[in-house]
Amino acid sequence: MIRAIVFDLDNTLTDFMKMKEAAIRGAIDAMIDAGFALPREQLRERVRTIYDERGLEFQNVFDELLEREFGEVDPKILAAGIVGYRRARESELVLYPHAQLVLLELLKRGIRLGVVSDAPRLQVWMRLCALGLQHVFDAVVTFDDTGERKPAAAPFREVLRRLDVGPHEAIMIGDWAERDVVGGKSLGMTTVFARYGDTFDTKVSGADHDIDDLLELIGIIDRIHGASPGSAKPTEG
């Protein structure tokens, strides 16, 4: 009996990489307009280099960019970059198709919902609030809550504890096989690979099920509960 579903957030419920790229483009255009005299592609490469070094959640990327280029922070260019980034981010931060429908159906069935993310706590909650999901989840576990990243057991154990369910009563769904699938499986959770959000061209996920649309999750639950097979696609091989 499945009593809880645990979601990864980025590239599982929302297309994080699409949003990030759009936000970076918005920031670059705004900084150039404010007087940053570098070609657009060159500026984009410098921003990507900082993210590669510091991680995609690094919050002072434009400060560091300006310090590297000019030895100091130009407040006008910095402000333009931040505003441009936020405007583009807000317009591009949307749920994947059928995500809202699936979440509502799960709530209607009385299934408890959780999130496990490697992102910092504030960033996770900002994204959930922007998506209108701040009241949907019974448990939200971020990197700050355990100090460990997936596939370590701690984040998964913590979300199961907060949801008050055992691992065999929960499904873990995520787009990163080496983290979401491996971590969930290690505790005995049923695992679902969100192939639609995969950015690594994963050939074999190792999950119990691969899906190309969130709507297929309902079919998986129905099959586990002995109802109809729905549209679930078991992992091949």
Residue ranges and their predicted role:
Residues 1-5, 17-18, 68, 78, ...:
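Asp-based, Mg2+/Mn2+-dependent phosphohydrolase catalytic module
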Residues 2-104, 122:
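N-terminal helical cap/lid subdomain that shapes the substrate entry/recognition surface
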